Amino acid sequence: MKYLAVAALLLGCAAPSAAAGLEELTPYFGPQYFTWKERNGGKTLLKEHGPIFCAGVRLGSVTSSSIAVRARAELFGGEVSYEGQTQAPESVPVDTRVSYFGGKGELDLGYRLETGPARLEPFAGVGYQGWFRDLQDSTASDGTSVSGYTEGWQVGYARLGARADAPLGRVRVSAEAGAKYPFYVGNTIDFSGSGKTTFHPKGRMSGFAELGAGYGNFRASLVFDALRFARSDLKSVQGTYYFQPDSSSDSFGLRLGWNF
């Protein structure tokens, strides 16, 4: 949390001098409710859920020919609860905590269409998201000690969507929605005694949405963001075969920002 607070403070201090020539420069922060699930053969293997926090900045510029270029950079992190089980063949329930810390960046190219005070902006873009997923040591329900481990995830994805905004009295309301497809997914685990192994789950179509309002320079929005992955291929580690199961993440959150 302290790193996110420092990031938010630095963004706020640097924003005024960087705002010249931009239509949008909005540092923001906020809470999210995060859920991570893994499944195999239709059965839920584990569920992680709880609050995490983010701090980031949005930038945007529109040329005289109505070409819109927009970018976002964000850090996020927090600790959530873990409800899962030990690995087969003797699966035993395990409850522990999981720490997340990561970041993401997105770059979009769009075209602005204006009808009176309302604006519509279809866009396409790319994004990168990386994070560490650190499972803490714990004790299973039968008293067995379970060692934690750390996963390092990297995801590259393409985005396609549209955003729109219009005045509503003294408030300007906005909406954004679209789909994204992960074209690269890597999950790296450092197995004791055998080094790092990277699993490559297959990307599945995922979605995102945002509903916001602005009053003066203040911005507030409700956001949803999802990632979907299909099971990876098997990999042998010291004679045992492992794989990354079908996995999904969902985040519902609030962003509060100030546009310079």
Enumerate the language-model features and the residues they cover.
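N-terminal signal peptide c-region/cleavage motif recognized by signal peptidases
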Residues: 13-17
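Short glycine/proline- and aromatic-enriched beta-strand/turn motifs that initiate or cap beta-hairpins
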Residues: 18-89, 251, 257-259
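Transmembrane beta-strands of outer-membrane beta-barrel proteins
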Residues: 23-29, 53, 65-73, 103-105, ...
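Transmembrane beta-strands of outer-membrane beta-barrel pores
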Residues: 31-37, 73-81, 126-134, 166-168, ...
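Extracellular loop and loop/strand-boundary signature of outer-membrane beta-barrel proteins
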Residues: 37-47, 83-98, 141-151, 186-201, ...
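Transmembrane beta-barrel domains of outer membrane proteins
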Residues: 56-60, 106-114, 163-167, 210-214, ...
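Gram-negative (and chloroplast) outer-membrane scaffold detector with strong preference
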Residues: 63-173
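Predominantly the C-terminal beta-signal and adjacent terminal strand-loop region
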Residues: 195-260
